[in-house]
UniProtKB/Swiss-Prot annotation:
UniProt similarity note: Belongs to the PanB family.
Species assigned in the record: Clostridium botulinum (strain Loch Maree / Type A3)
Cofactor note: Binds 1 Mg(2+) ion per subunit.
InterPro entries: Pantoate_hydroxy_MeTrfase, Pyrv/PenolPyrv_kinase-like_dom, Pyrv_kinase-like_dom_sf
Descriptive protein name: 3-methyl-2-oxobutanoate hydroxymethyltransferase
Claim: Metal-binding is one of the keywords in the record: yes
Chain's role: Catalyzes the reversible reaction in which hydroxymethyl group from 5,10-methylenetetrahydrofolate is transferred onto alpha-ketoisovalerate to form ketopantoate.
A molecular function (GO) term: 3-methyl-2-oxobutanoate hydroxymethyltransferase activity
Biochemical pathway: Cofactor biosynthesis; (R)-pantothenate biosynthesis; (R)-pantoate from 3-methyl-2-oxobutanoate: step 1/2
Intrachain disulfide bonds: none
Cofactor(s), names only, from the UniProt record: Mg(2+)
Segment forming the signal sequence: none
Length: 275
């Protein structure tokens, strides 16, 4: 049975943790979905982990719709959330509703996510009014990387911490069904999670959130050159891939692959007629 926004709320009410991961294509979505995950975020992080951009700012609506369609086709259980890219909702309330609608109508997503606190409250209200579920996102919001001066922990001083608490309450009032808390102190995320009735989903926000999300390439150690402090490695798929590719190259070079069992047969009398 497909997880819904109601499922997320029920899990919070029962005190059961919500599980989410990112996915960006059909095959990975199918694997993650079959593992029993509650939700999949098609994150604009695809700009960095799939497209090789320095940050998420270059990701377009067409990029997001393309990948969201693939993820939806690979799922039957998880709630699929489409991440609204930079400048798809900041320009006007009309644009916010229109682009959110494209995620639902064209890509088949079940909800959308957008970054920001009080500054996007009106956009969230309008999207929800259009019957589209919205997941909020506060703390370190990657689309604001230039304003933050880099990817830095947020909420370590009283002023910013109080602002994040207030933002969470405003997003709940605006109609968000859940809020991602990214890179904020663990004890602050506890206060926020206890201050609102909707679920909080943490990434680098400690254990007190109502759920957790990670970028799957990070938690499966696909890349060895960088791992955020908040990521735990739950596998070493990157090394396995490199080992497998290296072995493939070796066996092809040495004419050990393909073997006879990998080849298709043809009758000898047919072959003899070809010479």
């Amino acid at each position: 049975m497909r997880n819904t926004v109601s499922t997320f709320q029920e899990l919070k009410n029962k005190g059961e943790k919500i599980t989410m991961l990112t996915a960006y294509d059909y095959s990975m979505a199918k694997l993650i979905d079959s593992s029993g995950i509650n939700g999949i975020l098609v994150g604009d992080s695809l700009g960095m982990v799939c497209l090789g951009y320095e940050n998420t700012l270059s990701v377009t609506m067409e990029d997001m719709l393309h990948h969201t369609k693939a993820v939806v086709r690979g799922t039957s259980n998880a709630l699929v959330v489409g991440d609204m890219p930079f400048m798809s909702y900041q320009t006007s309330i009309y644009d916010a509703v229109y682009n959110a609608g494209r995620f639902i109508k064209e890509a088949g997503a079940h909800a959308v996510k957008l970054e920001g606190g009080a500054t996007v409250a009106e956009e969230i209200k309008a999207i929800v009014k259009a019957q589209i579920p919205v997941m909020g996102h506060i703390g370190l919001t990657p689309q604001s990387v230039n304003m933050f001066g880099g990817f830095k922990v947020q909420g370590k001083n009283e002023k910013v911490a109080k602002k994040l608490i207030e933002d969470a309450k405003i997003l709940e009032e605006a109609g968000a069904f859940a809020i991602v808390l990214e890179c904020i102190p663990e004890k602050l995320s506890k206060i926020i999670s206890e201050s609102i009735s909707i679920p909080t989903i943490g990434i680098g926000a400690g254990k007190y959130c109502d759920g957790q999300i990670l970028v799957y390439q990070d938690m499966l150690s696909m890349f060895s050159d960088f791992k955020p402090k908040f990521v735990k490695s739950f596998g070493s798929i990157g090394e396995s891939i490199k080992d497998g590719v290296s072995q493939y190259i070796k066996e092809v070079k040495e004419a050990k692959f393909p073997e006879e069992k990998h080849a298709f047969k043809i009758d000898d009398d047919v072959i003899n007629k070809l010479y």
